[in-house]
Amino acid sequence: MGGVGGCVNLRLKPNQHRHNYQKRTMTLQRILLLILTVFTLGAYAQKQPVDFVNPFIGTSNFGTTNPGPIAVRGMVSVSPFNVAGPKNLPLEKDSRWLSTPYVQENTFLTGFSHVNLSGVGCPELGVILAMPTAGDLEVDYLKYGTSYSDEVSKVGYYSNTLDDYNIKVEATATTRVGVSKYFFPKGDANILINLGLGLTNEQGASIRVVSPTEVEGVRSVGSFCYYKPEEAYPVYFVARFSRPADEFGVWKKPTTHKGAEAEWMGYNGKTRVMPGYAMEVVGDSIGSYMRYNFKEPTVVEMKVGISYVSIENARENLEKETSTRSFDQILEESKKNWNQYLSKIEVEGGAKEDKIKFYSALYHTLIHPSTLNDYNGDYPKMKTRETLRTQDTRYTVFSLWDTYRNLHQLMSLVYPRQQSNMVKSMLQIYDESGWLPKWELNATETTTMVGDPAGIVIADTYLKGIRDFDVEKAYAAMVKSADQIQDNPLRPGLMDYLEKGYLTTKTTNSGSVSTTQEYNISDYAIAQLARAL
């Protein structure tokens, strides 16, 4: 017999004695059972693509990925947040340009953020932070933050141990819900939701304790790359806990006043903790807490539903995606779904390290663009943010200057249905705003980077045979961006480009040569699509 899962050769002697028939039959049955067992073990012993993914790849050296669990193209990810506070210098978010909620070299953790970006170059999102602690209640993240150990990250799963509290944390996620398990020791325990802390440069939030098992609220985000502060927008959430809190409350740090008013205000500039407060609290530095007293080690599960439309939709997302499933069921389904997508490409040969690099890279291509619409199909309209509804998936995070060269070509070849929905999402953006996207984020146009890349993606998609979208509309949108001289957000300096054939340093300060090249490529894409129509 060969090794586990190997070929098994059997040679049975011919029947010589009838009285040994039953004995020989039972022996044959045992052998066949052993064969089936060996091949079953062999099948399980074979690694699947998810087993080769290392989510820590890209979390160092400004790779700006994070190791938190996320579903395929998920709206939600549960990332450890370790970029706040002087203990994380020099890689601290307020001390330098830093566009990620997690850096592998850092050691001081202040929570787990539920809305994050992966692989981008500008600080944004990194909000709705939850943090389990033990002992007395402390709401200052510089004081309740802690080092951590026993860090594990796999596809759909993250865990660590918070050293100061001896609390183990596990996390997984569905498309729109982050699910965490907190393993508390005996004694006093707290679960904090901090809406003042985040990676985003925007401020402003509201929070309300609905019951001893639920908190709801909204956090303002926006100003990606410090552009367009007028286009800040809300992220809504509902957090639900598996055990009712013994005590609950909120905190708020007000503005520091000076003069006579400060003399009368006993809490001037100080954080106010308000036990039992169940009204809505609005402010910049605010949060809520759930407090417990455990007579024995206890596990509390927390689910955080997210929506860009409303608190009601965040609650519905939570209920539809997680209410009937356990943590382990959600994790197993996430791994199964990831494996289905990663298995679209099978790799032979090479070393184990090569497969780790390949499948980790493929994994990262399936994070963004990500899902914008809620479970019921609702999503916010560009500019006005009124509620619209889609029957397909409405995608967001179109970092097209970064992705038009190769990511979308890969999507067309390997995941054509996703790519089709991405093109349809771009055309929805055109319908809503009047322009194709340039660098769209959660129904806002950041206009970051140069060029006019959406048309390149659309033309390439069509020429690769994916044609279940309104190509006439797409072509008209592409021509508009190439022809409209005035008030054109996609092609600044277009008049000079059309007259001279290139941009000058007097026309743009964003790189005249590179921008000219981008316009050239876009025009070529329009020409190729026109030829095919």
Predicted regions mapped to residue ranges:
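Ala/Thr-enriched low-complexity intrinsically disordered regions
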Residues: P14, T25-T27, T37
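Glycine-biased, low-complexity coil/linker segments
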Residues: M1-G3, I31, I35
